[in-house]
Structures are given as C-alpha cells and as structure tokens.
Amino acid sequence: MRITWFGHSAFRLDFGASHVLIDPFFTGNPAFEGGDAARASAVEGATHILITHGHGDHVGDTLAVAGETGAKVVTNYDLCMWLASKGLTNFDPMNTGGTTDQGAFRVTLVHADHSAGMSEAGVTVPLGLPNGIIVRAAGEPTVYHMGDTDIFGDMALIQEIYRPDVLMVPIGDRFTMGAETAALAVRKFFAPKAVIPCHYGSFPIIAPSADAFVSALDGSGIQVVVPHKGTAVTIP
C-alpha cells in the first residue's frame, strides 16, 4: 500500500486498482502545496472518497472531486444525505459500527470524540456523528484514520477487533488531542507497524509541527512516519 499525506488530515491510499481519498481538503487548506497541478495529481483516478466527519476541513473538495472523477463517497448517513442535497449522486451511506464492502476493501466507521456540522446561513446544520475509519483489504495493512478525536478508553476495543497496522493520528490540540495525549493513546492501546501524525501544521491555532509527538514516542519502539507532503510512502 502506498500512502500519501497532503497536509492536515487529507490522505490517499493506493493499492491494487483502488485509489482512495480520505478527508480530501485541498482548496483552502493552508498546508496543501503545489496548487492546481498538485490537486489534479492528488485526485487523479480516485475510486472512492471516505469522510470521517462533517466539518469543512474534512469534507473539503468532496463534491468537486466526486464530480470530476466519479469516485464513490462513503461516510455517515446524515452527511451523505446532506451531500446528496448538494448534487452528489454516487454514495454509500453507513453509520458508527457498520461495515460496507467496497469490493476490493471494506470500510468500517468507529467511534470518535468530536463534533460534526456545517454552517449554512449562519446556522450550524448537524451532520451526524464524527467517526474514525477502518480500511481493510486482503493482503494489505489495515489502516485506522482516527478522524478528529480525543483519547478514549474504547480504543482498546478498536485494537482488539481490528488490530490496525497503520494509524493516522490527529495531534494538533485545541480541536483534537494534543501530542502527548495522542502519543499516550498510541502506546496504551495499539501495536501498529507505523503511525502517521496529522491535523497539525495547517492553521495557526493548532500545533505547527509533529516534533512533540515524535519526541513523546521516542524509545517506544513504535515507528513514527512523518511524510513529506505529496510524497507517497510504502507500508508493506
């Protein structure tokens, strides 16, 4: 599996014939680099778009990318219906605890401690529950994108049930857990092959770098991968 980070919480997974975007926040993302050409490359051939929750910095360019590529959107029911009201036609709704079969892989929505909603005419429209996302494909590492969340005790059950190999962990503080708490979550609950920090280095009110997270896991034996934005890393 090749994993590409685009800044903030936006990722792309490439394995076999599947090209999966998670939280495709490009337009307006201060951390996204390369402009229109980089965006075109990031979304090229996308087959699926997975969204952890209904906030603008995670829904991002979903409608535009789905229109450009025909990618299927997989997310919680309420957010799917809201996107459908905006013109989305190819979607697969689900909810917390559920699993959907996408053919080459399965998607499961798990718990996250956060909120979800978008502002319309000055009023916040609730968009279902926030989630983490588990991606499982035969012969590939199991990926757990935590979405936006704090640490919570039932991460132990996520480890017991899904045994993720790759964690995408929000570390930016203020809107999610910060570096030390995120490192505690990784050490206490998981045994991954690799951990990729995210949700930092974008907006000035969250952590500017992953340095504190990397330091907090120093000596743990856990591999922390801090990718260069837009450059794929391979996880066996």
Swiss-Prot record:
What this protein is called in its record is UPF0173 metal-dependent hydrolase Mnod_3315
**According to its UniProt record, which protein family does this protein belong to?**
Belongs to the UPF0173 family.
Listed as disulfide-bonded, the cysteine pairs are: none
UniProt cross-references to SUPFAM superfamilies, sorted A to Z: Metallo-hydrolase/oxidoreductase
Keyword Transport in annotation:
no
In terms of Pfam families, this protein maps to: Lactamase_B_3
Please name the GO terms that the record assigns under molecular function. Answer: hydrolase activity
- Give the keywords, sorted: Hydrolase
Lineage, please?
Bacteria, Pseudomonadati, Pseudomonadota, Alphaproteobacteria, Hyphomicrobiales
Q: Which NCBIfam families match?
A: PRK00685.1
